[in-house]
């Protein structure tokens, strides 16, 4: 194990200095307590909520915190949501939920569902391209500009039509660090 560790570390060291990486979705600093928690939990499969039921309780609390932060319209005390391991998975889950809701509504109205689209800024998380390819959804991007460093709402609305599933806001635009007005 030590030889394998040294080979991998030597091979990747120059590429894996997070404090020097400003281009991807990585954490550049982590408190020692976060590191300790991760090390202590590395052998647990948190997806198995029957084995680790407290994880479901913590996830529910996090979902409620975010739902309240974003002023969701739900009145019940326990908000609806799903646990995602990373931002790509969270985008996929949210995208599928929005697409299925749009599709169900269109079918109930007797309208076609063959040309769905999503509208978002060009500062989107890259998984949205893959999502749109997988589900055959047209991706409509609103360019970021010097005067609009987050989603330009007026331009986004111009790109919407009856086939628009939703406008996807970005919380933490990679290029600017700013949040779309959610």
Residue ranges and their predicted role:
Residues 33, 53, 57, 89, ...:
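Conserved active-site and cofactor/substrate-binding residues in soluble primary-metabolism enzymes
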Residues 66, 70-74, 98, 102-106, ...:
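Structural motif corresponding to the C-terminal cap of alpha-helices
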Residues 85-88, 108-181:
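PLP-dependent aminotransferase-class I/II
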């Amino acid at each position: 194990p030590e030889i394998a560790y040294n080979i991998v570390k030597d091979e990747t060291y120059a590429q894996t200095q997070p404090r020097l990486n400003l281009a991807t979705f990585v954490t550049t600093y982590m408190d020692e307590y976060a590191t300790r928690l991760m090390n202590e939990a590395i052998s647990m499969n948190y997806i198995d909520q029957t084995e680790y039921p407290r994880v479901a309780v913590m996830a529910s609390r996090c979902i409620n915190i975010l739902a309240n932060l974003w002023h969701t319209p739900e009145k019940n005390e326990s908000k609806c949501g799903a646990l995602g391991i990373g931002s790509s998975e969270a985008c996929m889950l949210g995208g599928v939920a929005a697409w299925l809701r749009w599709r169900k509504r269109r079918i109930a109205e007797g309208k076609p569902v063959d040309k769905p689209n999503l509208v978002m800024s060009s500062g989107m998380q890259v998984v949205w391209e893959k999502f749109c390819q997988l589900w055959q959804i047209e991706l409509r991007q609103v360019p970021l500009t010097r005067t609009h460093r987050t989603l330009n709402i007026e331009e986004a609305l111009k790109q919407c039509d009856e086939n628009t599933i939703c406008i996807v806001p970005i919380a933490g635009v990679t290029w600017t660090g700013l949040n779309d007005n959610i």
